[in-house]
UniProtKB/Swiss-Prot annotation:
Entry annotated with the keyword Protein biosynthesis: no
Protein name: Matrix protein 1
Quaternary context: Homodimer and homomultimer. Interacts with NEP. Binds ribonucleocapsid by both interacting with genomic RNA and NP protein. May interact with HA and NA. Cannot bind NP without genomic RNA.
Source organism of this protein record: Influenza A virus (strain A/Duck/Germany/1949 H10N7)
Cellular localisation: Virion membrane; Host nucleus
Domain of life of the native organism: Viruses
Similarity section: Belongs to the influenza viruses Matrix protein M1 family.
GO biological process: viral budding from plasma membrane
Keywords, alphabetical: Host nucleus, Membrane, RNA-binding, Viral matrix protein, Virion
InterPro entries associated with the record: Flu_matrix_M1, Flu_matrix_M1_C, Flu_matrix_M1_N, Flu_matrix_M1_N_sub1, Flu_matrix_M1_N_sub2, INFV_M1
Residue span of motif Nuclear localization signal: 101-105
RNP-binding as annotated region, ranges: 165-252
GO cellular component annotations of the record: host cell nucleus; membrane; virion membrane
Amino acid sequence: MSLLTEVETYVLSIVPSGPLKAEIARRLEDVFAGKNTDLEALMEWLKTRPILSPLTKGILGFVFTLTVPSERGLQRRRFVQNALNGNGDPNNMDRAVKLYRKLKREITFHGAKEVALSYSTGALASCMGLIYNRMGTVTTEVAFGLVCATCEQIADSQHRSHRQMVTTTNPLIRHENRMVLASTTAKAMEQMAGSSEQAAEAMEVASQARQMVQAMRTIGTHPSSSAGLKDDLLENLQAYQKRMGVQMQRFK
């Protein structure tokens, strides 16, 4: 796996699924391929994106700044600086300085990542802030190691939280989660359907599913009534894809 592929993997792991994630992936690919060279326009686009947390925006801004060649005098962006200040906690800043000194001695991506993984997310963000604000310099490879360590920690905590929700025994949470998943699956079906005859069929199925979820939420239904809703939808989607000659078995 190449270095940039690894960086892209880690960074995308902390972005919530949805159309925005697909757009960010496309822009990252362009940046890493040297196609997008207007850093200012890229940062302005990032700043105004909804849904993303300030820290995720800060990390993406840091990655774009490391990768896109820019004029030396280009202003640092406030939204990135604020996200990478470790919540203003002086302890984070102290640890960030210690980490920075260790990173200065590293020359490889993996070496930097290993060193960084033993620090808290706040300290890692502060250390990125030091480098972003030009208070310290490390090689791009080492900076990417720091980015990936931060993303790994964030993804770990997101995974723990997700696992807790998936394994919860609370029937109301499970019921709502199934309805949310069915609704997003229906939305994806509508986006994937083109304008053929079969597409109209897929759109109809998706539309009915969304109406059903809306009705279930409006009148309040038994928590078990949503069981299998998403799976039924996915079966419909796969049947539609088969007729269109597309084989995508990995939706579940």
